Amino acid sequence: MENMEVLIKEVTTKKELMRFVKFNHELYKDSPYHVPGLIAEELMTLSKDKNPAFEIAEAIYFLAYKGDKIVGRIAGIINRRNNETYNKKNIRFGFVDFIDDAEVVDKLFGAVECWAKEKGMEIIHGPLGFTDLDHEGMLIEGFDQLGTMAALYNFDYYPAHLKRMGYAKDLDWQEFKIYIPKEVPEKHARVGEIVRIKYGLKTIKFRKRKEIWPYAQRIFDTLNKSYAHLYGFTKLTPKQIDYYVKMYIPMLRLDMITVIVREEDDAVVGFGISLPTLSRALQKAKGSMFPLGFIYLLRALYSKPKIVDLYLIGVLPEYQNKGVNALIFNDLIPVYNKAGVVYAESNPELETNNAIQAQWDYFKVEHHKTRRAFFKKL
């Protein structure tokens, strides 16, 4: 296969889209660190008739072949709303995987760059998805660490190829292991109580799934406002919020959700959503809920986990840096201890987001992964 010509083909059929998704699973089938996503969810994300992100974005997908064997994939995404908001002409690359072959990589990125120029774009950057809730960033440190459901894993040769092609650092995300203390840190407890009284806040917990539905829309509204300043973020549309609510709410573990509201009007001021790690369960499921995938996932979801993943933490801008995060973790730390949690995976945090990283000052933490967004002028 070494001397075979590399051919690039645009994905135009559902069968080809399935092959696009499955290539990631095939490439990493022997990796102990890669966490495969659910094939059905990935197909929904990439399908123009199912993902409401296509109301504000357009995309193209390419596969690289040597003979009849797929050796690479890449998506080009133009988020029109993000470009309009920030007056940019950017294209994103994402959903990118490839064998360690310079010709394959060059031709894959060449196809997206050519399409980008045809569309009048000026800068290509990524890996990014359609929204901030898709996978972001290419792993550059931590290749011997188990991945999470919320983040990409890639082989260590990926970033070297990007640099070889003239791509440079745009921004990094850092990931931490946050070791759970046996008790709520004294300062956290004190700050949380002061904040609760000063701003008239209360903590909401859910015992039945139906109780969370009235808050779901408000949680995402708060997410839109709290994430507005973050790299690559685009405000979610009402249809996108509905899409994510229906996708994620059914799989949440209720005791690991904390919502902070104003007592006077029940407005969602902040929230913390975490889950027992599903990494090993997803590896066993191999991309499918059936025949046994859903059993592996349910067992992991309702187990006594040693690891939890912090998926989403958000606080309204006017309440940021005022101690609301302390209220969230004052609630979650006892929950984690009761479940036997040793540490939490922070998942990607922007290196420039000092406020979010400052909240770990009172915890033992370990920086174990770094991922990068690359860019290149076209």
Where would I find each of the regions flagged by the language model?
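Catalytic core of tubulin tyrosine ligase-like
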Residues: 376
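Acyl-donor binding region in acyl/amide transferases
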Residues: 84-166, 285-362
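Short, solvent-exposed loop/turn segments at secondary-structure junctions
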Residues: 130-132, 181, 209, 277-279, ...
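TRNA-binding/sensing appendages of the translation machinery
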Residues: 3-44, 113
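Acyltransferase donor/substrate-recognition loop-hinge adjacent to the catalytic core
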Residues: 3-6, 152-230
